[in-house]
A protein has these predicted regions:
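Periplasmic-binding protein-like
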Residues: 193-198, 235-261
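A bilobed periplasmic-binding-protein/Venus flytrap-type ligand-binding module shared by bacterial periplasmic
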Residues: 134-139, 250-264, 282-283
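Extracytoplasmic ligand-binding site segments that recognize negatively charged/polar headgroups
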Residues: 35-38, 75-76, 81-205, 209-216
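Paired acidic/hydrophobic, glycine-rich loop segments that form the ligand-binding mouth/hinge
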Residues: 74-81, 204, 221-226, 241-243
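Mature extracytoplasmic/periplasmic domains
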Residues: 258, 263-266, 271-325
Length: 439
């Protein structure tokens, strides 16, 4: 009898020891804000006391580089971010691992016409996201500004100095927003609209969080953001509102198992939790305010909360993640050289163009109109044409490893040329607009 008791006890101890050996830390690499990650961390750890979630916060571009640089066995366990093209990059380089058992069968196959999950099963939609504009209602009232409805509204003269955006090279969600406009309007027309809006910008921030924070506290009037920034501000009680323009897209924010991670089995448990009914319900927390992947009849959604399927039906852009990924480096680099690093000159040109436009509306002048059109063309035309971004040889230059001395020299030369040309164009545009206003 004693031997049986001992044997049972020994087995229990061994089982316990085995459980302790399996229990450990799951490292989650993410660009998401603390309000979201901490909510999931606490809820999951409460259900799984033997597992600790470690959050490693980096922007999307830095996250990709981080995973690529680490050897197998030392990588984070999970990648969790909004940018679908980032997951395409990791999948193509065999840095993701399939985890089909983590999916929730209640989730739809598509959002609108966009697949929720990777067809190869390497990453999965965990939430949904659209892109639009948030604004501070008190700020707009104080400055007598109407709430914007479409991207084009932000290019109007009355919005000069009232708009904020983060740099797409530093924010994956902003890159998606910029790419959505470019895909919706077309390359050339899209850049014209972007540059007109950016001429009205008060700031281009380093991190995406700075834009909603600035709108929430009244520093900026309007922010170009991913939807959850605007919705989180609204449902947390700030005097803000949010709208999806017609030229938007709804795409999944994804979660994936990183190949060569340290704790695959327990990482899968966390992934499954984020897509479970309990995990999806967390998205309605006012500080999170994201769109779930599960149908609303399986959840308790707040009154008047946006329904992603309805937003997707109204959205005019069928987002092409492959196209976005192919020209990612070109778009982000161009934006920095034409906008981020030349904002002061672009603002000056835009201010002069607005002034000349007002003067010529009050007092029409053919020569002035001609000069103003020249100014607009100089200020609001992309330095790289659509033919270039369809050229694989041109795109390949930007895909190469920048640590290579020759590659770095080539790219730096291109970027310096763009920066110099942008400055020259903006300064010439300002002078032409001033001439137009003086006639």
């Amino acid at each position: 009898m004693r031997s049986k008791i001992w044997a049972s006890t020994a087995l229990a101890v061994l089982a316990g020891a085995s459980g302790l050996a399996q229990a450990g830390t799951v490292t989650v690499l993410t660009s998401f804000p603390k309000e979201l990650t901490s909510a999931y961390q606490k809820a999951f750890e409460a259900k799984n006391p033997g597992i600790k979630i470690e959050i490693l916060n980096k922007n999307t571009t830095a996250s990709i580089a981080y995973i690529k640089e680490l050897p197998a066995g030392q990588r984070p366990d999970i990648m969790w971010a909004s940018a679908p093209d980032a997951f395409e990059v990791l999948a193509r380089q065999q840095l993701l691992q399939s985890a089909p058992d983590t999916k929730n069968p209640q989730a739809p196959a598509k959002i609108g016409n966009y697949p929720l999950n990777d067809p190869q099963g390497l990453y999965y939609g965990q939430a949904l996201a659209g892109y639009g504009m948030m604004w501070n209602t008190r700020y707009l009232q104080a400055h007598k500004l109407a709430a914007p409805k479409e991207w084009a509204d932000l290019a109007r003269p009355e919005y000069f100095g009232h708009v904020a955006i983060s740099s797409p090279s530093r924010s994956g969600t902003t890159q998606l927003t910029v790419e959505t406009i470019l895909q919706g309007e077309g390359w050339d027309k899209g850049w014209t609209q972007l540059l007109q809006i950016m001429g009205n910008a008060a700031a281009v921030t380093d991190r995406s969080f700075a834009v909603p924070d600035g709108v929430n506290n009244g520093q900026y009037g309007v922010g170009i953001v991913i939807d959850f920034f605007g919705l989180a501000g609204k449902y947390s009680g700030f005097p803000v509102d949010f709208a999806y323009p017609s030229m938007t897209a709804v795409v999944p924010a994804n979660i994936a198992l990183v190949a060569g991670g340290k704790n695959t089995d327990e990482a899968k448990k966390f992934m499954a939790f984020t897509m479970s009914t309990e995990g999806q319900q967390l998205l309605f927390d006012p500080k999170i305010s994201r769109l779930p992947i599960l149908p609303y009849n399986t959840l308790k959604a707040p009154a008047n909360y946006p329904n992603p399927q309805e937003v997707a039906k109204r959205a005019k852009v069928q987002f092409d993640a492959d196209l976005s990924e192919a020209r990612y480096q070109v778009v982000t680099s161009m934006f920095d050289q034409m906008v981020t690093f030349r904002l002061k000159e672009l603002q000056a040109a835009t201010k002069a163009i607005h002034a000349a436009d007002k003067k010529l509306r009050d007092k029409p002048n053919a020569k002035g109109t001609e000069l103003l059109n020249q100014a607009r063309s100089l200020a609001y035309t992309s330095l790289v044409g659509e033919a270039n971004v369809k050229d694989n040889e041109f795109l390949e230059v930007f895909r190469k490893n920048r640590r290579d001395v020759a590659v770095s020299k080539q790219l730096t030369g291109l970027e310096e040329m763009w920066s110099s040309k942008a400055r020259e164009n903006y300064e010439r545009a300002a002078k032409l607009a001033e001439q137009a206003a003086s006639l």
